[in-house]
Amino acid sequence: MNNLFRSIPAVDLCLTALGQADPSLVEAPRGLMRDLITEFWDKKRHEIREGHCKKNEQLTLDACLPGLMTHVRAGLRSRFRAALNATGVVVHTNMGRSVLAKEAREAVITAATGYCNLELDMQSGGRGSRHALVEDLLCRLTGAEAALVVNNNAAAVLLVLDTFCKGGEVVVSRGELVEIGGSFRIPEVMEKSGATLREVGATNRTHLHDYSAAINENTRALMRVHTSNYRIVGFHSAVPLPELAALARRHDLPLIEDLGSGSLTDFSSCGLPDEPTVPSVLAQGADIATFSGDKVLGGPQAGIITGRKDMVDTLKRNPLTRALRCDKLCLAGLEATLRLYLDPEKARQKIPTLRMICRPAEELARAARTLAAALRKGLAGSSASCLVSLRADVSRVGGGAFPQYDLPTTLVCLKPENCSATALKAALLRTDPPLIGRLEDDSFCLDPRTLSAEDRPTLLRVLREALALAAKEII
């Protein structure tokens, strides 16, 4: 054991060896390099003490240089990395949700590259409002009197409740008390706003008289939460929006609609059910509608508030609005995305989220056949050999939208000859970029819905690397 400890080289020797093996490391931050080298050898020391070293293992610099190099490169690599999405989940929360349109990406780069008119009044040259940058567009697209953008939809709901319902009660159907992901629940957001939740009805059935009976002198608003991430089926009923809006008006109360993922377009032509759009809920009587910018809208992360001008103006004056506001990059990307919606057909072609959701099954089948042929050719021989097959399956919209509805697709499934599909999946997490797919019946499957033709060369490369790595680790 002592001999193993003594064989561990000095940090300076390691720095020199790493620089000789990879000259680009000479430019790496010296302090971080030293810490990474120390971290690597500390782990080796722990393995020695615990008796976990392999028999006859050598801890010389030459023997450990490949492992040390891998550890150092991993430590120097940016934590924020691009990835290939082959899951078929279009709005993949874990992978950054919506992919921005080319126009939106260019707008973000322009805003990031230099100064801009974020809060500059272009008429007077004085202080302006960042809210004005997208408000007119949102009003045109939704039919709202006014609009406000904050940094996500949970923030939008929090701001609305803090402004209009703090210290009072909000009446909500028990069947709409959703969990919105990451263990965050609508009742908890309400509690943080200072509003008191007043549940009405049963989980599966709520009637107009349930809302009416709950209204009292402490009631500040009626609220509907669109259950976009789950469905209640069977013996079920909910109050139609126009009826609830009429009840709210009779009692001089605002009706707040939390649409969650939110949409400006009708997806029924893509084979999906008729979901409420932002313009439709405002037209049917909602005073305020909140929704996300980075889900089926296809833009950057944002919480969008639309509705009555007097209410939106009050929201703008709430000090909490400053804490929740968006920066110039978000607003630039959102404006560019919204401008594409001025031509609905152009939006479906140019906004990746809409394009992927609406890709026809026949087009996906052709894409799968083309990809399968490329994989059979590109992975033939050596440790990368795989059995490649096609399988009819389904994709998901994701992001909590359309949870019950399937999008027909064709999967390209790989069954490796020299490792398991599970080992391949694990190895693909370590490639650059990582490739995320699906495990289906001992196969690793790729859904072309969320891949493009431009991804193919990179996809082939990382698959070859991962198959070789997985096979080597088994040996």
Curated annotation (Swiss-Prot):
UniProt protein name: L-seryl-tRNA(Sec) selenium transferase
Main location, first listed in the record: cytoplasm
Main enzyme class: transferase
Cofactor: pyridoxal 5'-phosphate
Catalysed reactions, semicolon-separated: L-seryl-tRNA(Sec) + selenophosphate + H(+) = L-selenocysteinyl-tRNA(Sec) + phosphate
Localization of this protein: Cytoplasm
Pathway listed: Aminoacyl-tRNA biosynthesis; selenocysteinyl-tRNA(Sec) biosynthesis; selenocysteinyl-tRNA(Sec) from L-seryl-tRNA(Sec) (bacterial route): step 1/1
Residue numbers bearing the N6-(pyridoxal phosphate)lysine modification: K295
Similarity comment: Belongs to the SelA family.
Gene Ontology cellular component terms for the protein in this record: cytoplasm
Free-text function comment from the UniProt entry: Converts seryl-tRNA(Sec) to selenocysteinyl-tRNA(Sec) required for selenoprotein biosynthesis.
Keyword Disulfide bond on entry: no
